[in-house]
């Protein structure tokens, strides 16, 4: 398929700007970087709660690091496999995807996501990646109705789970809980896909594909111990972004945890160093002993050097592989880690999950955020024309008039909030101590 088709935008543009020689993907990158949705990431939870420590990473700093790693992957792939350079011609495209990948995540991380998914259980569900697609294509007010109006290839690249909700949802929703405080996240896992409300935009993104490619790309399968079906494929650009995200999550969130004293050297030795000392890869086997020493060093520069060495190890272990059965080159090729490094990254991610994410103090913050989000949603849906800010009321009324999913408007409003704004609004609504007016139409 020609570049021209993948460079198309849903809304035709004829911007006559003086001496503007930027590529389509440089424009996409600028739109993302200057958006309100991107700015709000500075006050949204990454792993450690906002306010726990001045050192922690927010979703904004995480996204910047993912972008840096993503362009690093792209650069080394160009050198390692120059025959694929025509497909990897734009660093700005990869930057755009990495900067935008978390834009749809709600306040309070996974707690907020589970809360919104529960409140939307009869109205198409909620999931952060689906909301990212929705912000980019509908909600961000760069245009009136087309979001940021990004290129088709950029939207293809943001699709981590390229299938609609109804194709992936398994079974009927669980019984509602009697009290929000009883809600268990394990009972309400989000369906990872595109909301049915945005299905026609997904169709537009995939329009250049052959019928065979489209059917294969949209296919899904059952994964052991996961309630809902999962998609099986992603584009080349998305595979690079996802690897960069995984590396940043495993390595940089580990750094936060070490600095803040959340994990110990003994835990690291038992769960990471020992398993990797058995690796068949000589780099992993030889380097990890010195990496471990430097990671837990009291000297900041030694720890930073260890983090840099880890990131470099993963980035240089990535190659482009062929995916059977696709005609479109953007789908036929994916970036993938060498098996030994894939296993090493899985071990690191499991370590962060076990000792950081599942830590009771972190789970308490998630639980608190979960309650805040559900109670805000309950309040707004009880009387939208009374409690929603005026611009959101207008959207809600328009959806009601057209017979569209008005619950989605409330999910859009709450998911766009920062952690701090949601907490203040909750206090304003439910605490007797709150007496001041709030500016509901502010940019959170």
UniProtKB/Swiss-Prot annotation:
Gene3D superfamilies: Hypothetical protein af1432. Residues 59-250 form the HD domain. InterPro entries: dGTPase, dGTPase-like, dNTPase_2, HD/PDEase_dom, HD_domain, PHydrolase_assoc_dom. Residues 1-28 are annotated as: Disordered. GO terms for biological process: dGTP catabolic process. Pfam families: HD (PF01966), HD_assoc (PF13286). Belongs to the dGTPase family. Type 2 subfamily. PANTHER family: DEOXYGUANOSINETRIPHOSPHATE TRIPHOSPHOHYDROLASE-LIKE PROTEIN 2 (PTHR11373:SF40), DEOXYNUCLEOSIDE TRIPHOSPHATE TRIPHOSPHOHYDROLASE (PTHR11373). This is Deoxyguanosinetriphosphate triphosphohydrolase-like protein. It comes from Shewanella pealeana (strain ATCC 700345 / ANG-SQ1). The lineage of its organism: Bacteria, Pseudomonadati, Pseudomonadota, Gammaproteobacteria, Alteromonadales.
């Amino acid at each position: 398929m020609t570049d021209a088709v993948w460079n198309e935008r849903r809304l035709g543009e004829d911007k006559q700007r003086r001496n503007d020689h930027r590529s389509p993907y440089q424009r996409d990158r600028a739109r993302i970087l200057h958006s309100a949705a991107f700015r709000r990431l500075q006050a949204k939870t990454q792993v450690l709660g906002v306010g726990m420590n001045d050192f922690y990473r927010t979703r904004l700093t995480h996204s910047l690091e993912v972008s840096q790693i993503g362009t690093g992957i792209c650069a080394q792939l160009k050198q390692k496999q120059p025959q694929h350079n025509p497909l990897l011609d734009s660093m700005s495209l990869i930057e755009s995807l990495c900067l935008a990948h978390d834009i749809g995540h709600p306040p309070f991380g996974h707690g907020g996501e589970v809360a919104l998914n529960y409140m939307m259980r009869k109205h198409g569900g909620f999931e952060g990646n689906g909301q990212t697609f929705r912000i980019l294509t509908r909600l961000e007010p760069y245009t009136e109705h087309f979001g940021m109006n990004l290129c088709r290839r950029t939207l293809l690249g943001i699709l981590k789970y390229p299938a609609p909700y109804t194709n992936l949802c398994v079974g009927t929703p669980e019984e509602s809980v009697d009290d929000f405080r009883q809600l268990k996240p394990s009972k309400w896992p989000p369906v990872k896909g595109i909301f049915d409300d945005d299905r026609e935009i997904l169709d537009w993104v995939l329009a250049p594909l052959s019928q065979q490619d489209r059917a294969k790309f949209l296919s899904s399968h059952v994964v052991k111990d996961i309630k809902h079906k999962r998609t099986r494929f992603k584009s080349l650009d998305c595979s690079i972004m996802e690897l960069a995200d995984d590396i940043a999550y495993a390595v940089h969130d580990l750094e936060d945890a070490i600095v803040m004293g959340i994990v110990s050297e003994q835990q690291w030795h038992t769960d990471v160093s020992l398993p990797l000392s058995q690796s068949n890869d000589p780099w992993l086997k030889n380097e990890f002993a010195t990496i471990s020493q430097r990671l837990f060093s009291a000297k900041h520069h030694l720890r930073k050097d260890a983090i840099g060495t880890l990131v470099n190890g993963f980035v240089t272990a990535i190659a482009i592989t062929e995916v059977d059965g696709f005609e479109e080159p953007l789908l036929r090729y994916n970036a993938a880690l060498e098996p030994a490094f894939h296993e090493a990254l899985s071990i690191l991610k499991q370590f962060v999950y076990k000792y950081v994410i599942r830590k009771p103090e972190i789970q308490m913050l998630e639980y608190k955020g979960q309650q805040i989000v559900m109670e805000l949603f309950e309040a707004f849906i009880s009387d939208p024309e009374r409690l929603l800010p005026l611009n959101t009321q207008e959207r809600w009324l328009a959806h009601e008039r057209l017979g569209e999913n008005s619950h989605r408007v409330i999910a859009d409003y709450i998911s766009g909030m920062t952690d701090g704004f949601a907490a203040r609004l909750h206090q304003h609504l439910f605490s007797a101590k709150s007496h001041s007016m709030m500016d509901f139409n502010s940019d959170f």
